[in-house]
From Swiss-Prot:
Protein family (similarity comment): Belongs to the MDM34 family.
UniProt feature, compositional bias: Basic residues: 496-509, 774-784
Encoding gene (name): MDM34
Organism (species): Coprinopsis cinerea (strain Okayama-7 / 130 / ATCC MYA-4618 / FGSC 9003) (Inky cap fungus)
Family matches, as InterPro entries: Mdm34, SMP_LBD
One GO term (biological process): mitochondrion organization
Taxonomic lineage from the root: Eukaryota, Fungi, Dikarya, Basidiomycota, Agaricomycotina
GO MF: lipid binding
Protein name: Mitochondrial distribution and morphology protein 34
Region described as Disordered: 97-127, 157-221, 263-289, 357-377, 473-588, 627-663, 718-823
């Protein structure tokens, strides 16, 4: 593709010739509808297109195909529409003139009635009976016009201003439909209704009976569609398509529904009230009310009985690059992110946390959002299988007092001031019973107390299992530093830290009491164990953050203003785990840290899916029987081999892995140790060496070989040895030297290693550890595998076959091939 700096203009001559059209056409000519033409078959039979680029066959065929296709579409769709619209413009000038003259003649002949004179009854009857041939006094109604134009509000309003009255005597009326959908016809589609004088309204209806006997149109022919038969009677026939203009209006979301309902209900209510307020109904009003025209259905219905639309909730999410995005909140059908109003979360979902339910009871002293449940909290774990608590039988005082179903932009900060006590301020004995009925996941009261104290009493009632593990590690770890500041004086003065860490050996009941004492120092229940002065405040503990700490860390809400309002001795709590501000009252300038994931619950949930079993489904298995262990990664090579050897004197001496130490390197992390002077796998001459093998792939290890030489080989029973010669004497080989040739009588592999380890422990030469296994075949060798399986296949022979081929290629001089059958 070429990028031109300026537009490239290519002159081209194009000529269309040899047009040939042939088709069956249905042609309908009407004074009212104009000319309608429909092609039943493809009209274009042939067209020749010549251009400047006819010499290029590809371009010529492309131009021919494209232009011919466009012409066929034009004849089928565009040409009938063009002809129809042009004919309507011509019919409009011809049709409106006679009716205009009729109206003027009727005005001259008939005297105008008095304004208070009602329309006589026989006239209405004659109009209804002769509706098939009478002239309609109302033109084609526009769908976009208000619907109150078709109604009369009072008897005196019949002769009101002309702009409130519909235009009269512009088109003939269609016959009454047998389907019952419509009884009113449509006038000329493009004819502009003439504005008449107010006195024309009554006189034109009088003259309609005199001209009824002279039909000037043929409705059955005019309303016949040659393609689909009779046209729909209730649809407008104007070609301007005003009825479809609302389809192209800008989308306002759910606001469109509310505006439509309000406008429709208001217009219906106004129309009905105006109609009922009138003292009497005229014949025209009764006729218009009883008719079933397409545009009158909305005005004849009763008041709006549909339920109101629910209030649109909006959520605010942080935008990329700064700022926020406010959008309508979408709650899916199978999502429990937000409970419906009036439904208790305890009854709807039994798997709720005790701390959550207890925290939703208000303190009773403030009328603020004490019991509000923000959707952010409910969406943490709507039906969390990790914490399957059975809370259906909770006392009534622990039920939430008021549940808020506000949007996500509701302030969740004040929720931390909720007190897990009854409204009377006392302590209920049922609480300890319910606290001990924890089920499924090992998320005990002790762990809850530890977690709540580490997070500074935050509102995060659904902690992630990773957070629990991390806080459990912190609470059970030993405090190595001894010069920690003593907080006993501050505790005696009444301003000490209320959050201390219970030890791992404390009972659940003690941790439970400490939890409530630490959360609410004003409680009358004393703790069962005294506070320890050596307890470390949460900020002084060094957190061990894992790789997934940034993604799996739960966002905690900060309790600053509301909590400080009820507890002046408490300072603001910084809930950022990486914050250096402590939570003890000595620091009054603790900051509030809110993370961006606080408002975006979907991304917050998705960030925790670090494993395959972490899903958003409520049917996921719990972590009850899972054991997660972490350790350093083990690679393949000498660095990952753990080898220790002990000499006879009892002093452990680490050996070296590799050829320099005389031991072979095995693939998959196998290290073989050799003592001073060398030795076999488990025993050496003069020294007793114990070699430890740690790693993988011990069955495929080769002594004295590198990684490339320890690939397992298949074996065969009978092999023709290529370039074979007698093995050389390896008695003079230096320690660590390895002969890689003439392996016809040497054994490598798992069976030989097992042989040397079990049967031939004393067969090694002792010169080097790498020569273990490189020995003459022992007298008692294992039976080949084919003997047990009953097949003719021996893996050892096939290994020797491929090894001998490799050795033959390495020979500098060609060796004549000899076929010696191995016994």
């Amino acid at each position: 593709m070429l990028a031109a700096k300026q537009p490239l203009v290519v002159p081209m001559h194009l000529r269309l010739s040899h047009f040939r059209l042939s088709s069956y056409v249905v042609l309908v000519v009407s004074k009212q509808k104009g000319i309608t033409i429909v092609f039943k078959t493809d009209p274009l039979q042939n067209v020749d297109i010549n251009s400047t680029f006819d010499s290029i066959a590809v371009i010529q065929s492309f131009i021919q195909r494209e232009i011919e296709g466009q012409l066929r579409q034009m004849f089928r769709e565009d040409l009938p529409s063009i002809i129809h619209r042009l004919s309507q413009q011509w019919v409009k000038a011809k049709v409106e003139t006679p009716y205009k003259k009729q109206n003027q003649d009727s005005l001259q002949k008939a005297p105008p009635p008095t304004p208070t004179e009602p329309v006589p009854r026989p006239l209405g009857i004659s109009r209804s009976r002769s509706a098939g041939h009478a002239l309609e006094t109302m033109s084609t109604p526009d769908l976009s016009a208000p619907q109150f134009d078709r109604r009369r509000t009072a008897a005196s309003d019949i002769h009101g201003p002309a702009f409130l009255r519909p235009p009269l005597a512009t088109a003939p009326r269609r016959p009454q439909s047998t389907t019952g959908i419509s009884v009113a016809g449509r006038g000329s589609p493009l004819s502009a209704p003439p504005i008449t004088h107010p006195t024309n309204s009554s006189t034109s209806t009088i003259t309609s009976t005199s001209t009824a006997a002279e039909p000037s149109t043929f409705p059955d022919l005019e309303h016949f569609d040659p393609t689909y038969g009779l046209r729909p009677e209730g649809l407008p026939t104007k070609p301007v398509f005003k009825g479809f203009s609302k389809l192209f209006a800008p989308n306002k979301g759910l606001a469109d529904l509310a505006e439509e309902i309000s406008s429709q209900s208001s217009s219906v209510a106004d129309g009905d009230s105006d109609y009922l307020s009138s003292g009497s109904a005229t014949d025209e009003e009764e006729y218009e009310r009883n008719s079933y025209d397409f545009v009158e259905w909305g005005s004849t219905t009763g008041p709006n009985t549909t339920p109101p639309e629910p209030v649109v909730e909006y959520e605010t999410i942080p935008a990329i690059g700064g700022g926020t995005i406010t959008r309508p909140r979408v709650v899916h059908a199978q999502s429990q992110i937000q409970l419906p109003p009036g439904v208790s979360p305890v009854a709807s979902s039994p798997s709720r946390n005790v701390a959550t339910v207890l925290s939703r009871t208000g303190s009773g002293s403030n009328g603020s959002r004490s019991g509000a449940v923000t959707p952010g909290i409910l969406s943490r774990n709507p039906s969390n299988p990790y914490f399957a608590d059975r809370l259906a039988a909770l006392p009534h005082i622990y039920r939430p007092q008021n549940i808020s179903s506000g949007p996500l932009s509701a302030p969740p900060i004040a929720s931390s001031s909720r007190r897990p006590f009854s409204l009377a301020g006392g302590y209920d004995g049922h609480e300890d019973v319910k606290m001990k009925q924890r089920a499924s996941y090992a998320y005990s009261v002790h762990e809850e107390a530890v977690y709540m104290q580490h997070t500074g009493g935050a509102v995060n009632r659904y902690p992630h299992p990773y957070d629990l593990e991390r806080h459990r590690y912190q609470s059970e770890s030993k405090y190595d530093d001894e010069d920690i500041e003593d907080y006993s004086d501050e505790e005696d003065n009444g301003r000490g830290p209320h959050h201390y860490h219970p030890r791992a050996h404390r009972t659940r009941h003690e941790a439970h009491d400490d939890y409530f004492t630490s959360r609410h120092p004003s409680a009358s229940v004393p703790p069962s164990s005294p506070p320890r002065s050596s307890a470390r405040p949460p900020s002084t503990i060094k957190r061990r953050l894992s790789v997934s700490s940034n993604t799996t860390n739960r966002t905690s809400f900060s309790a600053s203003s509301a909590y400080k309002h009820h507890h002046p001795n408490h300072s603001s709590l910084s809930l950022d785990p990486s914050s250096s501000i402590s939570n003890h009252p000595g620091n009054d300038k603790a900051k509030i840290v809110l993370r961006p994931s606080l408002l975006n619950n979907s991304i917050h949930h998705l960030s925790t899916l670090s494993h395959s079993n972490h899903t958003l489904s409520p049917y996921t298995r719990s972590f009850e029987h899972f054991a997660v262990r972490s350790g350093p990664p083990r690679g393949s090579g000498a660095a990952s081999a753990v080898v220790k050897s002990g000499s006879g004197s009892g002093i452990p001496t680490p050996s070296t892995s590799g050829a320099g130490g005389g031991s072979g390197m095995a693939g998959g992390g196998i290290g073989l140790a050799s003592g001073s002077g060398g030795g076999s796998l488990g025993r050496a001459k003069g020294l007793t060496t114990t070699a430890g093998i740690v790693g993988l792939g011990a069955a495929t290890s080769r002594l004295g070989k590198t990684k490339a030489d320890v690939v397992p080989k298949a074996r065969r029973k009978r092999v023709f040895r290529i370039g074979g010669k007698k093995p050389e004497d390896n008695s003079n080989a230096a320690p660590g030297e390895t002969d890689t040739r003439n392996v016809s009588r040497e054994e490598y592999g798992a069976d030989e290693i097992g042989e040397g380890y079990v049967e031939g422990l004393g067969h090694a030469s002792g010169r080097a550890g790498s020569q273990m296994g490189k020995r003459p075949r022992p007298r008692h060798r294992k039976k080949p595998s084919y003997a047990a399986s009953g097949t003719d296949f021996d893996e050892a022979d096939m290994d020797r076959y491929f090894k001998s081929m490799h050795d033959a290629e390495e020979e500098a001089t060609p060796v004549p091939r000899s076929k010696d059958r191995r016994p």
